[in-house]
Amino acid sequence: MSLHLSNVILHQLSKNDQEELIVNYRAESLENDTASENLVAELHRVFNSKAGKGFGSFKSDSEFQQSLHEFRAGEQSFYDFSQKSALRLKDELSKYPFADEGTLVLAEYQSLATDYLFIGLLPSNQSLKVTEGLDISATDYLDISKMDIVARLDLSTYDTDKESNRYLTYIKGRVGRKVADFFLDFLQAEVGLDAKQQNQVLMQAVEDFVSDSKLEKEEAISYKKQVADYCNEQLKAGDEVQVRELSGELPASTDGTSFFDYTSEQGYELEDSFPADRATMRKLTKFVGAGGGLNVSFDSLLLGERIFYDPETDTLTIKGTPPNLRDQLTRNKS
């Protein structure tokens, strides 16, 4: 990938004998060599592939934002900025039960004509290696795929549109760890774009458009599949859903109204673009549900053909089961 690295540095967060989190500062920034570029390129790639991201923007009194401004204005060096950030990260992280040790990475770089600032605490893991003497020894490595205490600032958007509610991106982390709360506090930022909510609004707009257009069942299913296919392709490419672009790929209603015009006229509060959510978009073409030991998923076109639902008795009837399921049921019965 095309990546231009401006600055990158590592600091270490570890616990002392009193189990207190401390910072071991690196003496200077890393050289902008091939190894450093490969590290940042991998961080960028893995971050893009992570699901469950949150978006936000700085509060007006954010000390992190002020420190960033001083660095970018040349009033302090990248090294000084990284030290202040590491100390602030340590102080904030110490308030949480998941005060992890790890390697703190700060990187300023450009990818695909967009400037970024990456901040992440990378966990380490152990593996084995074979020495020149063919002995086995333990080695530590950065477990980049497991990183979840991480945020990225889109500097290009931040410079051109400070009113944006999404130039900060962070990984929400596992349930119960409150990583999202931590990063918002650390950066002194507030929640901005809700990507999942945007996907839900899009799905509702599609459902309403199909209903108002009075499409036949097959046409409605085809229309929803086009939307789902577009969103999945955007996900695979690492791109966002562009509402106007999506509308251009969809047929207009019988009176000639495009999907984009429909969402505008009906007052759906959709951003021009937003990240696709696979789980939400999946519901356009499938019925999905789980609970009480039951997990059900089937293509929406099967409803009324092989699968029937009676709301009065809350009964789902399936005609023709998958061969592997039928085999299990038959063997269990005997």
UniProtKB/Swiss-Prot annotation:
One Gene Ontology CC term in the entry: bacterial nucleoid
Compartments reported by the entry: Cytoplasm, Nucleoid
UniProt main location, coarse: cytoplasm
InterPro entries membership: Nucleoid_associated_NdpA (IPR007358)
UniProt GO MF annotations: double-stranded DNA binding; single-stranded RNA binding
Alphabetized Pfam families for the sequence: NA37
Domain of life, per lineage: Bacteria
Coiled-coil portions: none
Keywords of the record: Cytoplasm
Family: Belongs to the YejK family.
Record-given protein name: Nucleoid-associated protein VS_0951
Species the sequence originates in: Vibrio atlanticus (strain LGP32)
